[in-house]
Amino acid sequence: MTRDLEKLVAQTILQGFDAQYGRFLEVTAGAQQRFEQADWPAVQQAMKQRIHLYDHHVGLVVEQLRCITGIRCDDADFLARVKHIYTRLLPDYPRFEIAESFFNSVYCRLFNHRELTPDKLFVFSSQPEQRFREIPRPIAKTFVPTDGWQNMLEKLLSDVPLRLPWEDLPRDIGYIVAYLQRTFSAEQLAQATLQMANELFYRNKAAWLVGKLSLPDGIFPFLLPIHHNERGALFIDTCLTSQADASIVFGFARSYFMVYAPLPSALVAWLRDILPGKTTAELYLAIGCQKHSKTEYYREYLHYIAESEEQFIIAPGVKGMVMLVFTLPSFDRVFKVIKDRFAPQKEVSAERVMACYQLVKEHDRVGRMADTQEYENFVIDKHRISSELLDELWREVPDKLEDLGDRLVIRHLYMERRMTPLNLYLEQANAQQLHDVIEEYGNAIKQLAAANIFPGDMLFKNFGVTRHGRVVFYDYDEICYMTEVNFRKIPPPRHPEDELAAEPWYSVAPNDVFPEEFPHFLCSDRHIRTLFEEMHGDLFCADYWRALQQRIREGHIEDVYAYRRRKRFSQRADPRYTTAENDSGFCRNPA
């Protein structure tokens, strides 16, 4: 009887995951219709809905198990036996890897993230890495330019399943061919093979054709973002073939793609060729499997810990007033713990901070806010913690620590991509880097604002610089919606002595913001202030922010491009007469 109950529980968990992933695919499949109808508010709503599906279905399964098993549901040894049976259900299961993560989530919900040991949950996968020699549904279709690139691209684009007309397909094909001829030699293009993913990748206002361009000297990404104009006609906005550009398109600071992937492991394996710099966790994250990516991030962390002898240290940069941040010297992640007590000037609660981090996960991050993974009861061997960090932990977050002798448990933390703090980057930057990064910094603020996000604290220390030179915001405790802020001009002084007074001569409400004050606390360096005013002086005007607010209230959703504006075909000269692409510097207001 007990054996039958264990089998029933294992099957219930797997069926619960089937239901979750079925709904995940259902929401994803609606991306084509939302794109064709230009229903951008529905795009944003579907993104949030899909993120919530996972936790919702975990909750449903947990309630089912409590009804089925009674008190045995709280028996860790019982669930360890269930895990053994569950493992035997997976060898022929197409989404085994995410099913394992779903089991982990159910277990953690039942046991409040306690007793997290390999015998009770899938710390590592139970299945071999290369599961499927043959897949039931091909990931991609192959094209060969036997009759020339023009004809091949015409066939490729004519097969796109979108039910909208093309604005000018011959023109777009001409743009693509001209770009390829500038980028690669005629000999390379003659020997090329192109593989294109069968499914479109939807995000924001674009549907992406994603492909692999195989040339004699290697494999290159081949990315074509499809947009449509105000009349509902399709056009290709650019062609991207560099790994750096592809990495940004699939970057950690962007919303997840909606791509129909009934076999996600096969899609991830296929993408790895064009995104060799991305880890397994990052690829699962890019296609929207954020909970499984969390599992993979943790596995990457465990692998790094096992292969290194580094100690955890306090992260470089200015210490935060809300978060304690630490890292490993050569690891590409940081760990952030909410402090038990905040500095007096920080009028927020821990609950508010956590809500801000959840808002960022669900919101369109427009390439300017880093995604995070949330962990509970994170265990670290004490000998791997530097004495300075250990002292800092006990000083700042004692309520979130549990001492297990040779190990330390941190009850709650966030893991986030490590970047160079902007304030540290500025100290080392040469003249060109300084110009570029200040332009990027202003662009980041503008793009966040256009996406209805006001960063709140815009000091340099709250932004990071990625390896691609992009500026990304990562301090979320003061963010709010743009529509919640009251942008004001500073009233003229009533008397000359008002300007010398310690207190302002005008009233200030909690949500009041005075953009005229930004230069004083953002740019103490005169040279940096001059650069910023030249490129982004409009940020110091209340009218600029009010105009953005009005567009947001009217329901306007801005176009977001995962590449520089100068790369857009519409921004270039006629490609038939262009011999080289302008590739210098950052553009003004890239989106």
From Swiss-Prot:
Give the reaction(s) catalysed.
Answer: L-seryl-[isocitrate dehydrogenase] + ATP = O-phospho-L-seryl-[isocitrate dehydrogenase] + ADP + H(+)
Q: Subcellular location, in the record's words? A: Cytoplasm
Asked if the record carries the keyword Transferase, the reply is: yes
Q: Keywords in UniProt for this one?
A: ATP-binding, Cytoplasm, Glyoxylate bypass, Hydrolase, Kinase, Nucleotide-binding, Protein phosphatase, Serine/threonine-protein kinase, Transferase, Tricarboxylic acid cycle
Q: Identify the catalytic residues.
A: D371
The protein's matches in InterPro entries, at most eight in alphabetical order, are given as: AceK_kinase, AceK_regulatory, Isocitrate_DH_AceK
Recorded GO cellular component terms are: cytoplasm
Question: EC number(s)?
Answer: 2.7.11.5, 3.1.3.-
Residues that coordinate or bind ATP: A315, P316, G317, V318, K319, G320, M321, K336
Q: Which domain of life is it from?
A: Bacteria
Q: Which GO terms describe its molecular function?
A: [isocitrate dehydrogenase (NADP+)] kinase activity; AMP binding; ATP binding; phosphoprotein phosphatase activity; protein serine/threonine kinase activity
**Main location as per UniProt:** cytoplasm
Instruction: Write out the GO biological process terms.
Output: glucose metabolic process; glyoxylate cycle; tricarboxylic acid cycle
Similarity-based family:
Belongs to the AceK family.
What job does the chain carry out?
A: Bifunctional enzyme which can phosphorylate or dephosphorylate isocitrate dehydrogenase (IDH) on a specific serine residue. This is a regulatory mechanism which enables bacteria to bypass the Krebs cycle via the glyoxylate shunt in response to the source of carbon. When bacteria are grown on glucose, IDH is fully active and unphosphorylated, but when grown on acetate or ethanol, the activity of IDH declines drastically concomitant with its phosphorylation.
Quote the protein name from its UniProt record: Isocitrate dehydrogenase kinase/phosphatase
Species this protein is from = Pectobacterium carotovorum subsp. carotovorum (strain PC1)
Q: What is the lineage of its organism?
A: Bacteria, Pseudomonadati, Pseudomonadota, Gammaproteobacteria, Enterobacterales
Q: Tell me the name of the encoding gene.
A: aceK
